[in-house]
Amino acid sequence: MKNLNELSATSFGKGSKLQLIEQKTCIVVGIANSRTRLRIGVLLSELSEYQVDYISSESETGKLIEEADLIIGAGITAYEGVLRRKPVIVVGDYGFGGLVTPDTFRKHYNNRFRGRINGAKEESFSLENLEREICKGFNLTFQELQMMSNQTITLQNI
């Protein structure tokens, strides 16, 4: 995972000129519900330190998830994110499910990554909750992400 606002040096052309390019941490949003997607967009617009990409078609899902540092989504987007060892925050038709962790993975999986367990349709959530979960997501270890990916594969094969 990239560090927040990591700077990289790149050489262009024949000269020895070096240009610093700021690479923002990439968050990919894959939410089918238009109201929820709009709400997430409004909240993320307050957090300028992230590059935010939205999945708009199935054909680009794999590429965007692979390039992402963190996924916000529901259903197949969240499922794919876990499989690819990405931090995933579940936000779906049933509200704000929060960060998928080793402790919450099985509940989210059984709920098909649709939102908060026992959540209500289109329930509201705050920028503070989203921001807190984003920070927690970037603190997940590779081992934790790998473990959840392996569990997904195991459950898929049952």
What does each of the following model-derived ranges do?
Residues 68:
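An anion/phosphate-binding loop that grips the pyrophosphate of nucleotide cofactors and donors
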Residues 136-156:
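A short, well-ordered alpha-helix in the C-terminal region of glycosyltransferases
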Residues 32, 53-64, 76-78, 94:
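Conserved active-site histidine-acidic residue motif and adjacent donor-binding/catalytic loop
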Residues 39-43, 63-64, 80, 84-86:
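A short acidic, amphipathic alpha-helical/loop segment
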Residues 1-58:
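Conserved catalytic-core segment of nucleotide-activated headgroup transferases in glycan assembly
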